[in-house]
């Protein structure tokens, strides 16, 4: 394993080890993008069953983070790393382990999942999905992370060949690397959370009510995806047909070629189940109504975002969605008139559906009703990877995690049944042993 000389490399290694052991190896169907790729091969080749057993026993059943972290630190594959750490670094690594172990607590209100929203990527990107309702103003303390102050040299070298963002802290007056589970939270122009901080710890605070199954998002910055986020591909921009989706939206509605579908296209669309065809949801209709009335997205940069933090990328790099930019730039815009027609909007979403999924089969989960892509599954009533992973870990259907409550309920029912049986038994015994009345005495 490579010697880690800098504070940045040490904490980057911590995060890579934690994501490798506590996400990738815990029934996760994809692979988390690593920060520096410093993880030793012996750690990458570790068997997942021992890690899952620790999570099941000490986190899901006993909710004991300390004991779980203690058992993980005893893996012999971690010895080369632990021997090089000072006592302070060991405490920091243990604390980082607990951040990721907290993801599996029964009280945790979210789940690390994946999304195909950004179809430039060759694989699904990580995202955070709410498992329970989260009220506005509530701190999502388990969705936290650590900020690492960067030197100018580290800022120039960070993420070479990668696409990692960094935080700018006005309090620290420095660029900082953002590590921990909260780094999986994606950007949205109409975000439902904002950053909150205490010391070097950072977490998310809910700014509006979040429903179960809704993605937890935050606002990065006003110019993170180009000038005024003109290249943004978030869910809100997709529903509005603006920014990165603007060219595709206008082309879908104005191009005459789009209206004349080939028979193969029609057959492909009709072969999809009704639930898999795009139907304008009530949530999308509300977005359309806002647009029709001349409304705009909420200004998260001024109202929802903690002013201390905003996300940037190094100046020598650009965040480029290469495939989307190429696809959208190749489409000629023939008309720039406002598009307020619901039919145009439906056509835009259908075209986007085809571009995002191609000819791959799309299924609808039998449990959570979310659509997903899995070419290995033959049964259209299959469960999505999120629900399969959840069921393996908690032995309960998503989103329920409270296994302890279920066991207490079963024990209580068993106790009631036992008492009922005792009452019935004593009653029958009293009838059998009741003395006969002597009428002659």
From Swiss-Prot:
Q: Which Gene3D superfamilies match?
A: Histone-lysine N-methyltransferase (1.10.10.1700), SET domain (2.170.270.10)
UniProt-annotated location(s) = Nucleus; Chromosome
Q: What is its EC number?
A: 2.1.1.372
- Gene Ontology CC: cell division site; chromatin; cytosol; mitotic spindle pole body; nucleus
The GO molecular function terms of this record are: histone binding; histone H4K20 methyltransferase activity; histone H4K20 trimethyltransferase activity; nucleosome binding
What CDD domains does UniProt report for this protein, alphabetically? SET_Suv4-20-like (cd10524)
Effect annotated for changing residue 220 to A: Loss of function
User: A GO BP term, please?
Assistant: methylation
Q: A Pfam family matched by this chain, by name?
A: SET
Which UniProt key words apply to this protein? Chromatin regulator, Chromosome, Methyltransferase, Nucleus, S-adenosyl-L-methionine, Transferase
**Reaction equation(s) it catalyzes:** L-lysyl(20)-[histone H4] + 3 S-adenosyl-L-methionine = N(6),N(6),N(6)-trimethyl-L-lysyl(20)-[histone H4] + 3 S-adenosyl-L-homocysteine + 3 H(+)
Domain named SET: which ranges? 108-221
Q: What is its main location?
A: nucleus
Q: Write down the superkingdom of origin.
A: Eukaryota
| Enzymatic class | transferase
Q: Which family does it belong to?
A: Belongs to the class V-like SAM-binding methyltransferase superfamily. Histone-lysine methyltransferase family. Suvar4-20 subfamily.
Protein purpose: Histone methyltransferase that specifically trimethylates 'Lys-20' of histone H4 to form H4K20me3. H4 'Lys-20' methylation is apparently not involved in the regulation of gene expression or heterochromatin function but participates in DNA damage response by giving a 'histone mark' required for the recruitment of the checkpoint protein Crb2 to sites of DNA damage.
Q: What is this protein called?
A: Histone-lysine N-methyltransferase set9
């Amino acid at each position: 394993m490579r010697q880690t000389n800098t504070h940045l490399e040490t904490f980057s290694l911590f995060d890579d080890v934690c994501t490798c052991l506590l996400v990738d190896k815990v029934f996760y169907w994809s692979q988390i993008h690593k920060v520096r790729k410093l993880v030793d091969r012996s750690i990458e080749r570790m068997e997942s069953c021992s890690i899952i057993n620790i999570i099941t026993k000490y986190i899901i059943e006993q909710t004991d983070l300390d004991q779980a972290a203690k058992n993980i630190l005893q893996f012999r594959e971690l010895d080369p790393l632990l021997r090089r750490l000072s006592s302070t670094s060991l405490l920091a690594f243990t604390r980082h382990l607990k951040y990721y172990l907290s993801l599996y607590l029964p009280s945790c209100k979210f789940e690390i999942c994946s999304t195909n929203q950004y179809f430039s990527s060759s694989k699904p990107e990580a995202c955070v999905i709410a498992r329970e309702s989260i009220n506005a103003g509530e701190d999502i303390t388990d969705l936290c992370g650590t900020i690492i102050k960067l030197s100018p040299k580290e800022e120039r070298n960070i993420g070479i060949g990668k696409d990692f963002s960094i935080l700018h802290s006005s309090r620290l007056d420095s660029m900082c690397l953002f590590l921990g589970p909260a780094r999986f939270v994606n950007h949205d122009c109409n975000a439902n959370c904002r950053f909150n901080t205490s010391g070097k710890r950072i977490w998310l605070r809910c700014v509006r009510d979040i429903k179960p199954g809704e993605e937890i998002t935050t606002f990065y910055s006003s110019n993170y995806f180009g000038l005024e986020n003109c290249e943004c591909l978030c869910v809100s921009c997709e529903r509005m047909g603006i920014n990165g989706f603007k060219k595709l939206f206008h082309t879908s509605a104005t191009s005459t070629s789009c209206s004349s579908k080939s028979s193969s296209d029609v057959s492909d669309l009709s072969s999809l189940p009704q639930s898999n065809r795009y139907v304008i949801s009530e949530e999308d209709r509300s977005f359309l109504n806002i647009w029709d009335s001349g409304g705009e997205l909420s200004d998260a940069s001024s109202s929802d975002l903690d002013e201390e933090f905003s996300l940037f990328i190094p100046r020598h790099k650009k965040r480029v969605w290469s495939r989307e930019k190429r696809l959208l730039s190749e489409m000629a815009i023939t008309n720039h008139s406002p598009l307020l027609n619901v039919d145009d909007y439906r056509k835009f979403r259908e075209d986007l559906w085809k571009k995002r999924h191609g000819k791959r089969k799309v299924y609808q989960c039998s449990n959570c009703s979310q659509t997903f892509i899995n070419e290995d599954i033959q049964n259209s009533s299959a469960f999505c990877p999120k629900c399969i992973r959840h069921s393996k870990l908690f032995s309960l259907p998503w989103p329920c995690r409270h296994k302890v409550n279920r066991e207490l309920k079963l024990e209580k029912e068993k106790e009631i049944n036992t008492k009922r049986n005792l009452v019935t038994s004593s009653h029958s015994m009293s009838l059998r042993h009741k003395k006969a009345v002597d009428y002659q005495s």
